[in-house]
């Protein structure tokens, strides 16, 4: 089910009673104030209402021990929710970074390599190396507490994470744009379903 954005925390609690897990999708930049920084000029559109809503859903899911799968913005918002921070603009803040923002006309085309920790849950699904699409200009700077980086690009930018308890996992790319052509990515969604079915 799609959960509508709301500023009413009690509604978030009602929504969470109806689901066994969360998928947090892509979207706008996260307001830098949530990780203690002022915005740089390259920050794009932000939506504080959506930020607060996502943080509340994450808080409730963690409290209720329900699984969470984050995609792109979802990857970043999970890191911030766990106390981490972000590079607000990789091209201007990370010297030597590769291109992480490909043409939007090629959403189903893998453009860079991600090296995975084969011992991690996501590594067991995706293998040691995987090529992914990429549509982001922000990325993890300081890792949130209780999270582990399990996949990165050659420039060191994190691309996949898991929580220590295994209930949270996220990727910086967009597997929903890839799985028709590259079925291995369906395994990420299967993992969420499998974890949710145990609740």
Show the residue positions of the predicted features:
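Catalytic nucleophile loop
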Residues: 22-23, 59-85
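Class I SAM-dependent methyltransferase SAM-binding "motif I" and its flanking Rossmann-like core
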Residues: 88
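Amide-donor transfer/coupling interface in amidating biosynthetic enzymes
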Residues: 1-20, 24, 49-64, 91-199
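Short, well-structured alpha-helical patches and their helix-loop capping segments
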Residues: 46-53, 70, 78, 82, ...
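Short glycine-/acidic-enriched loop or helix-start segments at secondary-structure transitions
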Residues: 12, 32-35, 79-81, 180
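Ubiquitous "structural anchor" signal
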Residues: 34-35, 44, 62, 82, ...
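Glycine/threonine-rich flexible loop motifs
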Residues: 32-49, 181
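Short glycine-rich anion-binding loops that position phosphate/pyrophosphate groups of nucleotides
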Residues: 27-30
